[in-house]
Amino acid sequence: MSKHVAVLLGGTSAEREVSLNSGKACADALEGEGYRVTRVDVGPDIASVLTALRPDAAFNALHGPDGEDGTIQGLLEILKIPYTHSGVLASALAMNKERAKTVMRAAGVDVPEGRIVNRREAARTHPLPPPYVVKPIAEGSSVGVIIVRDGRSHPPQILASEEWTFGEQVLAEPYIAGRELTCGVMGDKALGVIEVKAATGDWYDYDAKYAPGGSVHVLPAELKPNVYQRVQELSLTAHQALGCRGVSRADLRYDDTPGGTGLLVVLEVNTQPGMTQTSLVPEMAAHAGLSFGELVRWMVEDASLNR
């Protein structure tokens, strides 16, 4: 009998649409690989739904709070349902950007400097000299990220408004010029390195990530061999330091601008990277010789408890 896999998708976070797309792609691919699949749009009744289903494994295609912060992982541990991706602690750590930086820094991974400030304080006075970046402590997909350009006289006022729904504390970091790099990790191996370029502008924001034609992916990234290898080493070290399992993706900045610092830093580790057939990790896996179906099959067969 084929293995029964519950694909967890949707949810209620700001990344719901991304999760629906990831979940559909993974569910379709798993059916193509011969698994019996149930698509589960996650809501408040998720515990009773999974208790009734009793799947052999859960494929976690959720993004954002509740899906990649240790919450759903803890529930799956309680229900004794093996699941994909990282466990409770690694998920919670990686979702909190400042705490993740503390752990990565202790493991020798270069990360940006920065400080946590109250959002209203950051709307009154610049928390850092411009240019700098303000971001929610626990969101993904560039949701809520603001770049404050050099020469801007006033801090971003949206931080003091009711429109800001991403928490009272924000993370401010110096803006690092240069290139946006990303590297996936699968098990104990780093995949290829992609340079991501926004089709318009100089920032890889939510629209650049998900709108058709919003970005250009250069794979393999055109880097000196030693830099390429260093990106892979940093990504794998960050994955291991945070205790990640299965598949993750590290996002980095590399300042190779004329007269620049040469700085190479890990911005964050995504424990639930996008999983459509055109997402970054599947693209890296394909470059390494793995089809999308083979990738999701590996993830299901890697599923376990106590991750």
UniProtKB/Swiss-Prot annotation:
Which UniProt keywords are present, listed alphabetically?
ATP-binding, Cell shape, Cell wall biogenesis/degradation, Cytoplasm, Ligase, Magnesium, Manganese, Metal-binding, Nucleotide-binding, Peptidoglycan synthesis
Q: What is this protein called?
A: D-alanine--D-alanine ligase
The ATP-grasp domain, residue ranges: 101-301
Ligand binding (ATP): 127-182
This protein's GO CC annotations: cytoplasm
Q: Name one GO biological process term.
A: peptidoglycan biosynthetic process
Q: Which reaction does it catalyse?
A: 2 D-alanine + ATP = D-alanyl-D-alanine + ADP + phosphate + H(+)
The primary gene name is ddl
Q: What InterPro entries does the database record attribute to this sequence?
A: ATP-grasp, ATP_grasp_subdomain_1, D-Ala_lig_Van_CS, D_ala_D_ala, Dala_Dala_lig_C, Dala_Dala_lig_N, PreATP-grasp_dom_sf
Q: Which residues form a coiled coil?
A: none
Q: How is the cofactor bound?
A: Binds 2 magnesium or manganese ions per subunit.
Q: Where in the cell is it found?
A: Cytoplasm
Q: What cofactor does this chain's UniProt record say it requires?
A: Mg(2+); Mn(2+)
Could you tell me the EC number(s) of this protein? 6.3.2.4
Principal subcellular localization: cytoplasm
Family matches, as PANTHER family? D-ALANINE--D-ALANINE LIGASE, D-ALANINE--D-ALANINE LIGASE B
Q: Which family does it belong to?
A: Belongs to the D-alanine--D-alanine ligase family.
Q: Which residues bind Mg(2+) 2?
A: E268, N270
Q: Which Gene3D superfamilies match?
A: 3.40.50.20, ATP-grasp fold, A domain (3.30.1490.20), ATP-grasp fold, B domain (3.30.470.20)
**MF annotations from Gene Ontology:** ATP binding; D-alanine-D-alanine ligase activity; metal ion binding
Organism, per UniProt? Methylobacterium radiotolerans (strain ATCC 27329 / DSM 1819 / JCM 2831 / NBRC 15690 / NCIMB 10815 / 0-1)
